[in-house]
Swiss-Prot record:
Major place of residence: cytoplasm
Protein name per Swiss-Prot or TrEMBL: Cysteine--tRNA ligase
One Pfam family of this chain: CysS_C
EC number: 6.1.1.16
Binding site for Zn(2+): 27, 208, 233, 237
Length: 459
């Protein structure tokens, strides 16, 4: 298995620290607002990778943190006239709800930053003792970036050039504009914890360093996050952790590509910013997940109506292949392994989901061909298609439920019309019964009558 390591800037053969085990950390959400489509992109990308590792037999420990104390959280809570706890709890629940709708697996561990304050304080104390950190005149503690010789190795940036082109706000207490805060002294009314430097709260960067150290150890296999976090967040994590622990922080770094909207950067100022809930009001979770998983994880992805409609058509092609056929493992044909090998080859090469999906469509085509000629063989291929779709986390909805929930006709209205048609038949008003059938047929709804009643599906 090879994949692109942002640290080295090239594809590398993956070698876990411990055979058959993977320790992976993914930077989680700062829960000051609703999750947006960019969050969905990042966490679906790493969910696919997590699922693939498990499919390949690895015992995966995935830690995905929650940043539940931050300047943005305090600011938003004050604006709303509520406590930070109320804001955080509501947004965590909303995050869990939308992630579940998108079929994102729960992480092995989901620490909140405030659960690891003692470990953060201990790391900061170590950094001060080693000369990597200092306390400013106002009480804040800062990291001394010039002390860390490898600063910039992840983002491939030179510290001297960064300093010259710095647009960082000049803070008098800092020795250098690039120095960043490790511990921030509390202002009146803000959440605070005791420390050797006075009551305050941790800086954002030290939170992830401490949580990963506590749950995965000083060195672990993979650190993941959105490409927007590469600098300064991930660069600062490396500086803190490697100075404190005197060893490599993470061996491999994975960064997911950003979402653009109609080829423009997504931002509230451009009025092209979408929350996950807003997107799911228009498109089924299956479609949204497929769309976000269909591009290589580290590439940019363009959010547009055309691309989502294409994703919808693709999802329906896969679902239609599995319609009216029962997946049966024991019926798996001997040559089915060829499809699985092609799927593995694609995913083993930097998690190439477009190529993996091409294999799934080849399988779907095979199933459709065999449905009328060899149902036994078709059912075996259907089992394999289901199995490989599960690796990508797609086709997680019941087939008929998906088509009932699809765009267009409302399910409750269809059920009312079916009930009216049933009554019309009882009353021997066959003209009205036929009229309803034709009306639904024009909406793409197919009725199937049986001794037990009438069922429907979208054609």
């Amino acid at each position: 298995m090879i994949f692109y390591n942002s640290l080295s800037g090239q594809k590398e053969q993956f070698k876990p620290i411990e055979a058959n085990k993977i320790k992976m950390y993914a930077c989680g959400v700062t829960v000051y607002d609703d999750c947006h489509i960019g969050h969905a992109r990042t966490y679906i990308a790493f969910d696919v990778i997590n699922r693939y590792f498990k499919y390949r037999g690895y015992d995966v420990t995935l830690v995905r943190n929650i940043t539940n104390i931050d300047d943005k959280i305090i600011k938003r809570a004050n604006e709303n006239g509520e406590s930070t706890t109320e804001l955080v709890e509501r947004n965590i629940k909303a995050m869990h709800d939308v992630f579940a709708r998108l079929n994102i697996l729960k992480p092995s561990k989901e620490p909140r930053a405030t659960e690891t304050i003692p470990e953060m304080v201990a790391m900061i104390e170590t950094l001060i003792k080693k000369g990597y950190a200092y306390q400013g005149a106002n009480g804040d503690v800062f990291y001394r970036v010039t002390k860390f010789a490898d600063y910039g190795k992840l983002s491939k940036q030179n510290l001297e050039a960064l300093q010259q082109g710095s647009r960082v706000d000049v803070v008098e207490e800092k020795e250098n504009p690039m120095d960043f805060v490790l511990w921030k002294m509390a202002k009146e009314g803000e959440p605070a914890w005791d420390s050797p430097w006075g009551a305050g709260r941790p800086g954002w960067h030290i939170e992830c360093s401490a949580m990963s150290k506590k749950l995965l150890g000083n060195t672990f296999d993979i650190h993941a996050g959105g490409s927007d976090l590469r600098f300064p967040h991930h660069e600062n994590e490396i500086a803190q952790s490697e100075a404190c622990n005197e060893c490599t922080f993470a061996n491999y770094w994975l960064h997911s590509g950003m979402v653009k909207v109609n080829a423009e950067k997504m931002s509230k100022s451009l009025n092209n910013f979408f929350t996950i809930v807003e997107v799911l009001e228009e498109y089924h979770p299956e479609v949204v997940r497929y769309f976000l998983a269909s591009t290589v994880y580290r590439s940019e992805i363009n959010y547009s109506k055309e691309n989502l409609e294409n994703a919808k058509a693709s999802v329906e092609r896969l679902f239609n292949a599995l319609r009216d056929i029962e997946p049966i493992e024991v019926n798996l044909p001997d040559d089915a392994s060829e499809y699985e090998e092609k799927f593995i080859k694609a995913m083993d090469n930097d998690f190439n989901t477009p190529e993996a999906l091409a294999v799934l469509f080849s399988l779907a085509k095979e199933i459709n061909t065999l449905k009328t000629t060899n149902k036994y063989k078709a059912s075996g291929y259907a089992y394999l298609l289901r199995k490989l779709c599960d690796v990508l986390g797609i086709l997680f909805t019941d087939i008929e439920e998906y088509f009932k929930q699809g765009d267009g006709a409302d399910a409750s209205e269809i059920e009312k019309l079916i009930a009216e048609r049933t009554q019309a038949k009882k009353d021997k008003n066959y003209a009205r019964a036929d009229e309803i059938r034709n009306q639904l047929q024009q909406q793409g709804i197919i009725l199937e009558d049986s001794a037990t009643g009438t069922t429907w599906k979208k054609g």
